[in-house]
A protein has these predicted regions:
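Short, solvent-exposed loop/edge segments of extracellular or virion-exposed proteins
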Residues: 27-30
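Non-catalytic cap/lid and distal C-terminal segments of serine-dependent acyl enzymes
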Residues: 25, 37-66, 71-384
Length: 384
C-alpha cells in the first residue's frame, strides 16, 4: 500500500512538472528574445514559426514599412534594423499572408482603434519622455460622468503627483482623441501619463489635470467597458455637433468633481485629427471657456456642413478672437493628408486677423507626430 501511494505521488509529480514545463515553453515561445535592443540602438525582432513559409514584419522602423524576415535553421525568423533614433516604435507579423499578429514573445502591446501592435522604446531624449522614469508619478483614473443627454460617458483623468494628498487647485487640459479612438487612445499610444509625469518632474510643464473624454457619441466607453457588449472599434466619427453640444457638461462635471481652477485662463483644449476638429469647434462655440487651444493635424471641413454647430465659422472665429486666446497653436506634418485643409484654415485666420502659432513637422498623420505635439503644447500651457 505504501509503495502504491509512493507510485501515485511520483506520477502526479511527473505530470505536474511536465505540465509546468509545457506551459513555460508556451510562455517563453521556445526561449525567443524579442524585441532585443542592442547597444548601437538597433533592434532584433524574432518570431518562432518553424512551419511558416514566409513571415513579413510590418513596422514603422524598416524601409518601406514591410520587410521579409529571414528563417534560421532553428525555425526562428529574424530581422535586425539599422540604428534607430530615440522614439517609440510599433510592429506586427503577417505569417503566410494571414491576418497580422502581435509578437508572442513580448507583453508590450498597445491598441490603436481596432489594431493591436507590439512596441518598444529606444531610450534617449525623446524616448525617455515616453517611458516611466524615476520621478514622482501622477495617477490615472477611469471615471463615469453623466452628460447633458442623460447618458453616462467614460473618461480617463490624469492627476499630477501629490494631488491626492494636497489641497491645491490645478489647471485642466482637455485632450481629445481622433476618429475611431476612445478615452484610452492618448494613454496607450499617446503616452500621456509618462509624458506629463516626466515634463512636470523636469519643471518643463506646469502640474495640471488632463481629462480625456470618450468623443465617439456612438459609444459611451472603450471596448469592453460598457453594457454595449463586445463590439469592434472602427473608424466611426462624431462630427455631427453632438459631442460639441454636450461639452459644457463635461467641463461642469470636471469642475464639480476635481480641484480645478475654474477659469478660462486655466483651461486648455487640444486634440488630434477629429479631436482637433472638435477642439476648434468647441473653442469657437464657447469662446469664454478656453484660453489655450491646440489643433494637432486637425480635420477641417470645407464648405457648408449642414450642421448648425459648425456654421457661421468666420463670425464665430471673430467673436472668439475678440478676446484673444493666450495660445492658439496649430501643428501638422508636411506629409499629412490634411495638410492642404490646414493651409486653407490658416489663410482664413490670417484674413480675419486672428493671431495663432504654427508648427510644421515632417511626417504624416501619425502618432509619432501627435506625441511630439503634446510634448510641445504642454510646455506652453498656463505660463502667461
Amino acid at each position: 500500500m505504501i509503495r502504491l501511494r509512493r507510485l501515485f505521488i511520483t506520477l502526479f509529480a511527473f505530470v505536474g512538472i511536465s505540465s509546468l514545463s509545457a506551459q513555460q515553453n508556451l510562455w517563453q515561445t521556445k526561449g525567443v528574445i524579442s524585441p532585443e535592443l542592442l547597444d548601437d540602438n538597433s533592434v532584433v525582432i524574432r518570431l518562432y514559426a518553424p512551419e511558416a513559409k514566409s513571415v513579413v514584419l510590418k513596422c514603422d522602423f524598416a524601409p518601406g514599412g514591410n520587410v521579409e524576415m529571414q528563417r534560421g535553421d532553428d525555425g526562428v525568423w529574424e530581422y535586425r534594423s539599422e540604428s534607430l533614433a530615440s522614439e517609440l516604435y510599433c510592429y506586427r507579423f503577417s505569417i503566410d499572408g494571414m491576418a497580422d499578429i502581435v509578437d508572442p514573445a513580448s507583453t508590450y502591446v498597445i491598441r490603436d482603434v481596432g489594431s493591436l501592435m507590439s512596441y518598444f522604446i529606444v531610450a534617449g531624449e525623446r524616448g525617455d519622455l515616453y517611458a516611466p522614469q524615476g520621478v514622482k508619478h501622477g495617477s490615472l483614473s477611469r471615471v463615469w460622468a453623466k452628460m447633458s443627454d442623460g447618458r453616462e460617458r467614460r473618461m480617463a483623468v490624469y492627476t499630477p503627483a501629490g494631488y491626492e494628498r494636497g489641497k491645491a487647485k490645478y489647471p485642466v487640459l482637455y485632450l481629445l482623441h481622433g476618429m475611431g479612438g476612445d478615452e484610452e487612445a492618448w494613454i496607450a499610444t499617446g503616452r500621456v501619463v509618462e509624458i506629463m509625469d516626466n515634463l512636470i518632474a523636469e519643471g518643463k510643464a506646469e502640474p495640471m489635470i488632463v481629462v480625456m473624454p470618450n468623443g465617439c457619441t456612438k459609444h459611451v466607453a472603450a471596448p469592453g467597458y460598457s453594457e454595449e457588449g463586445m463590439f469592434s472599434p472602427y473608424m466611426s466619427g462624431s462630427m455631427d455637433g453632438s459631442f460639441e453640444a454636450m461639452f459644457p457638461a463635461v467641463v461642469e462635471w470636471v469642475d464639480a468633481t476635481y480641484r480645478t481652477i475654474a477659469k478660462p485662463e486655466k483651461r486648455a483644449i487640444a486634440g488630434l485629427s477629429m479631436g482637433g476638429f472638435h477642439a476648434m469647434q468647441i473653442s469657437k462655440h464657447y469662446p469664454d471657456m478656453f484660453d489655450y487651444v491646440g489643433l494637432f493635424s486637425a480635420a477641417i471641413f470645407r464648405g457648408e456642413s449642414g450642421v448648425e454647430m459648425y456654421e457661421k465659422l468666420e463670425e464665430r472665429l471673430i467673436r472668439q478672437f475678440d478676446h484673444e486666446p493666450k495660445l492658439y497653436w496649430i501643428a501638422i506634418g508636411s506629409g499629412d493628408f490634411l495638410y492642404d485643409e490646414n493651409v486653407e484654415y490658416r489663410a482664413l485666420l490670417d484674413k480675419l486677423g486672428c493671431n495663432y502659432t504654427y508648427s510644421e513637422s515632417t511626417g504624416g498623420h501619425e502618432w509619432r507626430n501627435w506625441r511630439i505635439y503634446l510634448c510641445e503644447f504642454a510646455q506652453m500651457l498656463f505660463k502667461k
